[in-house]
């Protein structure tokens, strides 16, 4: 029997997700041949330029015994187009960072500037200070390649950032007043929801302004795309905290090292840090509820582990167990300027509960809990090599998309290839840990922790 006799042909339909374009409301825009054609650093070969027919399939894995792949959703592939909708001499680009810090922010800013400057010959590039409010309350900073040359070696964001300050009319009025015709927005889910409103208002006013977003969330909780920039750096840096907790726990009788990692609504950092470390005895994430007392609870598991090894390491994501922590009425109402509920410190609470448990069940026996919270250390570091490269590809993808006339989109990888995704589709998505996925099973097989499902 030949190999061909084992092949079964499948027919599928591809549904291309529509991407907003400037010509949707400005149909008479003139096109230009891309400056890349005459750029000394580029020698375009066959396949270098992409077209409308270049797409990326969103879903690539199927169980053919259960689901027939009758249709696929596809997105436009990111990359340079031969015909663009901007004259390089007339581009005025604005770049803004919003929300919390994340490794790689300065790399994204740098590469937006370098990409616009070196690839497309743009000279009017401006940085918006301190987030969305900077559009209307502060003077912009003129950027050039010399200024941003070493920014990728710095943590944080040189442009500064803040939460809140979103005033739609003031922001779009400022975009008009300053004459920006390209706006690059770097931020997380709250920022992306704001970007959708900015894009819709620009479209309503029929302004010649392309809007692109680069998703930023160290928690890796933005949906559709493979991952967010800064995530791999965060997992790498979390190893130091876990190693320190392990040393502390090993160095004391009945020692427990407790590490709180970032992850408001999802436990990706905790999960990947646990898999990478192999020093973790229990990983607690928001997607998998746990309980403290009784059969199959956390305390029973830790008691057995302390009897076996004399020490244990627990990693907990910051959004875990929030409904278990007592709150005052005032605490129940608190939100930050982005509208996110302010979480209580699960690490402080869990440390206290561990000590209460031990004092009741093992009064007089030695016991130590060392709590490590590396949150601000992790998010403030410079990006590692992998994230630096990733930020470069994201930035250049966004530039190529805006130059091609696309607008209201997010640049990001899908199945390892870069695509343009409509902002309104991605803004309200969440990438959460699937506790039925093999990766979570790997965590439990390594730690041997219970599933915390009450019988």
Segment roles from a protein language model:
Residues 1-42, 330-455:
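C-terminal non-catalytic interaction/assembly regions of soluble proteins
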Residues 2-34, 82, 86-133:
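N-terminal phosphate-binding or glycine-rich loops at protein starts, especially the Walker A/P-loop
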Residues 52-87, 133-181, 218, 229-236, ...:
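Glycine-rich oxoanion-binding loops at beta->alpha junctions
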Residues 88-96, 131, 149-159, 216-226, ...:
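Gly-rich Lys/Arg/Thr-decorated short loops/hinges at beta-loop-alpha junctions or inter-strand turns
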Residues 92-102, 157-160, 181-187, 213, ...:
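Short glycine-rich or small-residue beta-strand-to-loop segments that form or flank ligand, phosphate
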Residues 102-112, 135, 166-171, 189-197, ...:
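Short glycine/serine/threonine-rich phosphate/pyrophosphate-binding segments
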Residues 110-157, 364-369:
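Anionic-ligand anchoring segments at beta-strand to alpha-helix junctions in alpha/beta enzyme folds, i.e.
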Residues 174, 185-187, 193-208, 212, ...:
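Accessory alpha-helical/coil subdomains and C-terminal extensions
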């Amino acid at each position: 029997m030949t190999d061909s006799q084992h092949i079964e042909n499948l027919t599928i339909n591809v549904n291309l997700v529509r991407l907003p374009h400037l010509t949707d409301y400005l149909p008479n825009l003139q096109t230009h041949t891309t400056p890349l054609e005459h750029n000394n650093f580029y020698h375009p070969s066959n396949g270098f330029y992409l077209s409308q027919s270049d797409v990326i399939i969103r879903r690539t894995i199927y169980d053919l015994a259960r689901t027939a792949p009758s249709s696929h959703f596809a997105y436009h592939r990111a990359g340079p187009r031969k015909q663009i909708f901007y004259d390089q001499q007339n581009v005025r680009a604005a770049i803004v960072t919003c929300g919390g810090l994340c490794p790689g922010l300065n790399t994204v800013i740098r590469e937006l500037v370098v990409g616009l400057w070196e690839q497309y010959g743009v000279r009017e590039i401006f940085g918006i200070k301190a987030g969305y409010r900077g559009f209307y309350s502060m003077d912009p900073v003129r950027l050039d390649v010399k200024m941003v040359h070493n920014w990728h070696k710095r943590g944080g964001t040189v442009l500064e950032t803040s939460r809140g300050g979103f005033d739609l009319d003031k922001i779009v009025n400022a975009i008009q007043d300053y004459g920006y015709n390209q706006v690059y927005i770097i931020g997380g889910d709250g920022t992306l929801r704001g970007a959708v409103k900015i894009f819709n208002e620009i479209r309503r006013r029929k302004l010649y302004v392309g809007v692109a977003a680069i998703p930023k969330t160290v928690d890796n909780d933005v949906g559709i795309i493979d991952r967010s920039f800064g995530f791999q750096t965060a997992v790498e840096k979390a190893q130091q905290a876990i190693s320190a907790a392990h040393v502390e726990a090993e160095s004391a009788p009945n020692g427990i090292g407790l590490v709180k990692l970032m992850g408001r609504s999802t436990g990706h950092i905790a999960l990947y840090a646990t898999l990478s470390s192999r020093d973790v005895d229990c990983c607690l994430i928001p997607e998998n509820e746990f309980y403290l007392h009784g059969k199959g609870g956390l305390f029973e598991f830790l008691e057995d582990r302390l009897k076996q090894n004399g020490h244990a390491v627990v990693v907990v994501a910051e959004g875990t167990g929030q409904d278990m922590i007592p709150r005052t009425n005032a605490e129940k109402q608190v939100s930050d300027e982005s509208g996110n509920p302010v979480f209580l410190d699960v690490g402080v609470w869990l440390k206290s509960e561990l000590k209460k448990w031990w004092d009741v069940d093992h009064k007089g026996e030695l016991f130590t809990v060392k709590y490590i919270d590396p949150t601000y250390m992790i998010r403030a570091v410079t990006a590692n090599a992998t994230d630096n490269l990733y930020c470069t590809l994201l930035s250049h993808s966004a530039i190529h998309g805006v130059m091609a006339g696309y607008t209201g989109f997010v640049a990001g990888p899908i199945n390892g290839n870069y695509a343009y995704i409509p902002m309104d589709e991605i803004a309200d998505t969440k990438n959460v840990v699937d506790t039925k996925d093999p990766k979570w099973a790997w965590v439990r097989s390594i730690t041997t922790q219970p599933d915390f499902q009450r019988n």
